[in-house]
A protein has these predicted regions:
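Residue-level detector of alpha-helix initiation sites
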Residues: 10, 122-126, 260, 309
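Phosphate-binding loop of NTP-binding sites
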Residues: 72-76, 85-224, 231-238, 267, ...
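Phosphate-bearing ligand-interacting subdomains
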Residues: 44-99
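Residue-level signal for inorganic ion chemistry
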Residues: 19, 81, 118, 194, ...
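ATP-dependent carboxylate-amine ligase
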Residues: 1-35, 40-50, 136, 271-276, ...
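Short beta-strand "acidic-cap" motif of Rossmann-like dinucleotide-binding folds
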Residues: 26-30, 143-144, 171, 245
Length: 426
């Protein structure tokens, strides 16, 4: 079988890797001729390169990659296509899908499985893992994955895995930018909404538009929303069944009121699925923070809070609960200047020190300009390496609390693992 992957962003590259891993041949293309291909699981030595100033072609036995152009004939020869989720609904994708089937239509075993989606701005990954632990403790075989940006292997990987295995439940993390795509690809029975916040506004433009996307997504499904969620009346009207959830009241290792709500959502879904209360309680009592998500470590006198918080609402939810001496903030990509609004929140809470480090890309200069324009009068420091971050953490470790977060999941995981190691040795 051969598939065409159109668009080599995060989801596209994860689709390529999943297809190759499942024995498919792949034609992959992106109009950007400078796409970073380092995370494709293909040995470079096995490839032939054809390169000019505008286009690049890479050929091996199992994959052909065209950058800077698209070979329509190569797409026509494929059994299925995998478009980038962000392209779904656009004119180009619609034209492609008139002539070629999407992978989720060629492989459709996943559509017969009981399927739960978790979406929202913040807390999706943690909630998915909480629910997975509960369901597996109840004896269910769960296939979990979805949103490549959340650390999973992408939506197409779920389609491929479901085709080959036997599972009781499909559990999907759904990015808020891919609601229409996921609504087409999967047949959701239940959907949980963690929250609605200020993220991906370059796509949604307004919260009202985001709400409208959710209304479309919720139509005809059993939907779980927080008891005080904005737009609950709209969501209830769209849903086949609407269930409110509340903050979790039992033992939980994770910090923050936001995680009590995440646990409340996971437990509400479990109750609807008739999972025994003691199974839910024991599963959540043992639950550890997901790698890269908010966790707390002790170094000398300081509590070190470390975790990805890449939008203003995520950061505010942490800073509103604790006074921090220093905030370490990872910077966004060059084309994501809107994400710098996390610095507005940082300045509002007025820590003694703000430390900037390269997160997704080295946009420290942009972040420095933003801080200065906001009139922040505290101490601003910049660092470029993990060792420099650790040196400053040690310097501040006799204060009460330090926060490390912002953008850059991989960078934050590296920091988290080093901090954890130091904490365990003390």
């Amino acid at each position: 079988m051969r598939a065409a992957v159109i668009g080599l962003g995060v989801e596209g590259k994860k689709a390529v890797n999943s297809l190759l891993r499942h024995g498919w041949e792949v034609y992959a293309t992106d109009l950007n001729n400078r796409v970073d291909l380092s995370d494709l699981d293909v040995p470079i030595m096995s490839m032939d390169f054809v390169n000019d100033e505008q286009t690049v072609s890479i050929v091996s036995d199992e994959i052909t990659v065209d950058l800077g152009f698209t070979n329509s004939y190569a797409i026509e020869q494929c059994d299925a296509i995998a478009i980038a989720p962000s392209m779904y609904g656009g004119a180009f994708a619609t034209r492609l899908l008139r002539d070629s089937p999407l992978l989720s239509d060629v492989l459709d075993k996943h559509k017969s499985m009981f399927t739960i989606g978790i979406t929202g701005t913040n807390g999706k990954t943690t909630t998915v893992h909480m629910l997975k632990n509960i369901l597996e403790s109840a004896g269910k075989k769960v296939l979990v994955g979805g949103n490549g940006g959340g650390g999973f292997s992408g939506y197409y990987d779920l389609v491929l895995e479901a085709e080959e295995g036997e599972y009781d439940i499909l559990l999907v993390e759904v990015c808020d930018m891919t609601l229409d795509f996921c609504n087409y690809c999967f047949d959701f029975d239940m959907v949980g909404l963690t929250n609605i916040g200020n993220d991906h506004m370059d796509v949604h433009k307004t919260i009202a538009n985001y709400k409208d996307s959710l209304v479309r997504f919720f139509k005809g499904k059993t939907v779980f929303t927080a008891f005080n969620q904005d737009f609950n009346a709209d969501f209830k009207e769209a849903a086949a069944k609407s269930i409110s959830y509340f903050s979790y009241q039992d033992e939980l290792k994770l910090v923050g009121a936001f995680n009590l709500l995440n646990a409340g959502l996971a437990s509400a879904i479990a109750r609807e699925l008739k999972v025994p209360k003691d199974v839910v309680r024991d599963s959540l009592a043992d639950f550890e923070a997901v790698r890269g998500r908010m966790d707390v470590y002790k170094i000398n006198n300081a509590s070190i809070y470390v975790g990805k918080t890449d939008n203003s609402d995520a950061l505010a939810s942490i800073l509103s609960e604790k006074d921090f001496y220093a905030l370490f903030i990872g910077t966004p990509r060059y084309n994501e200047e809107h994400r710098l609004d996390i610095l507005d929140v940082a300045v509002k809470y007025n820590p003694e020190v703000i430390v900037l480090f390269p997160g997704l890309e080295d946009t420290v200069d942009m972040a420095m300009y933003r801080l200065n324009s906001l009139g922040y009068e505290g101490n601003i420091k910049t660092v470029n390496s993990l060792d420099e971050i650790i040196e400053l953490v040690a310097e501040y470790s006799h204060e009460d609390a330090i926060f490390i977060g912002g953008n850059g999941q991989d960078a934050i995981i590296d920091i988290q693992e080093r901090i954890k190691l130091i904490s365990e040795k003390l």
